[in-house]
Amino acid sequence: MSDEQTPIQAAVEEPILNSPFYEPAQHWIYNREGHAIKSHGRRPAQYHYLTQRTGSAQGALEGIGSDEGADDLPLINRLREDVKRWRNSGYENATQVTKQLLRHWGRKDRTRRLFFCQVEAVETVIYLTEILESGRKPRFKPRVSIEDFQNLCQGKQPHFVTEDRIDPNVREDHFPTLIDSPWDKSLQPLRRYGCKMATGSGKTLVMAMLITWAFCNRGRVAGDTRFANSVLVACPNLTVKERLQVLRPERPDNYYDAFDIVPSALRPLMNQGRVLVENWHQFAPESPHVEGGSSYRIVDKGEESPEAFCKRVLGDLAERGPIMVLNDEAHHAYRPAPPDQRKTKFKSKTDEDLEFGQADKDDIAEATVWVGGLDKINQSAGIQFCVDLSATPFYLAGTGYIEGAPFPWLVSDFGLTDAIESGITKIPRLPISDTTGKPDPKFFKLWEEIRNAASASDMIRGKPKPQFVLQQAEAALTTLAAQWKARFDQHQEATTEQAFVPPAMIVVCDNTDIAQLFYEYISGETQIEIEEKGKTKKTTSYGKSGLFEELKNAEDQTYTLRIDTKLLADAEAGAGQTKSQHAEQLREIVATVGTRGAPGEKIRCVVSVQMLTEGWDANNVTQILGLRAFGSQLLCEQVVGRGLR
């Protein structure tokens, strides 16, 4: 695209338009000249694409070129209207317990008010269960009819897709669905409800509200099996698993009491339910040679049956009837496309041939194990439905689906832009000018500028050499670091030494060689070879930082952290996986950046190759430097979201 087709969007000095506690009433749009215009009404649910569309009526996203645009999500937009009218009706036809809970959550005099996006996500799941699935006709004419809902639950095309489809170029074989069917057609499909929620908008509280709704209703009417009395919370790693223990009602630090989720009169009903929090690694099939947690050559139990799997993973929950599943960071929990339907090939993970954000064979294996485990639970114990929570519920390149396509079972959407406009997250700032004299600032598309400036001698295996990247990016790095230093000084002057938690800067690199060079430049920490007793050995040297002394590492203190992605992944696997002491120390440091009194308290800069792992909930990130391509909405939201808490 030419520069004329992609104008730099003008800064919005006051981007917050809405209250976080009410439905958005305004939103920003950009015209073709890149100027922000305030638009009345709520932003329609949509996703951005590069070339191919998978929704209904394609809408041109103003201000960008012909190979980029936005497509609407018709199921979400229609459900928004229906849920709003149901809300205004006083939640007609809901149970008395549900009405009591929804009124409690919506009270304006709450000490900790709940965000509108949290309540709406829960309302949508409740509406689907208590109204549409139960066949209760509301007094208003719904945009999603009961017949539409039944079609969605059978994998059939709902009538409204035909009504909304006005662009002949949209794929006719793609439409919303609320089921996820296994490749083996003899198995029952999973019912899935996807809720897109921006990073920092409170997914854990949404899970707590859904558990409360299910347990209180089931506790009040034991025979009402629409409501589960057992919940499995599936998560991506050990760090998230540890943090989500607050969803267990019996814990002293539970969220139900801390955030006043359950009215006191209903609190005893919570004790009748059971919550299990588990990371997906436990869904991996057990070896036939394992007995009692140990491996034996002479033991061969055969392939693990769904019943044995359920008993191992769920324990006594396996006997408690159909369960509700909450998938946290659910963009990992997808079913790879069948071989005959794949639009892209699977790749191995190497810096040379795998683009950032492209699924590799390990990602595919993780998704297969996660969803395969849910299939086994559904076969044996039964799953009422899954609620998938994610800030980025889109398919990656390499999964066999169109890159960036949304999961088809999304039912609610409150994305990053909505969260910014509602004041829920920090306000990001992008470079919009510099002193180069060029129409576009170099820092705005830094990686693209670096690649364009590279000659053949500056490249190796098709990518810029690390030293060339540092040379080209030094000005941008210095600028961001100067802003970080100013914030660091402000924080240090405003707080006592005991209470001081430093701001953190993130540098996300294209490959390990670039990451290592930037780490050495920022931290001053390098590996050198020395001669000792006639032998050469490596030792660590601590020199000056190329930026500020406040980022310099010393033998007894680490301020700049280089994340070893492989080592961190091993640690996050948790029980049942090989885990070194060093890997566990790294996990604890990364998981507690910005947390006073914790191992990561003093970290000031993080250098990594891949996106930082889920569960990295630091709220002290102030700068992010991206030194690699960010080619999709998913990647931008994932990386930028790390700095907006």
Describe each model-derived feature in a short phrase.
Residues 1-123:
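N-terminal accessory nucleic-acid engagement/regulatory domains that precede
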Residues 25, 29, 33-34, 40-41, ...:
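Interdomain helical connector at the RecA1-RecA2 junction of SF1/SF2 helicase-like NTPases
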Residues 86-196:
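Conserved pre-motif I regulatory segment
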Residues 99, 112, 136-145, 149, ...:
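Conserved C-terminal RecA-like helicase domain
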Residues 203-217:
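Motif I (Walker A/P-loop) of helicase-class P-loop NTPases
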Residues 206, 224-255, 281-282, 510-515:
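Conserved Walker A/P-loop ATP-binding site and its immediately adjacent core
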Residues 275-326, 333-376, 584-595, 608-609:
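Conserved RecA-like ASCE ATPase "motif II neighborhood" in helicase/translocase motors
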Residues 611-629, 637-640:
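A short beta-strand element within the Helicase C-terminal
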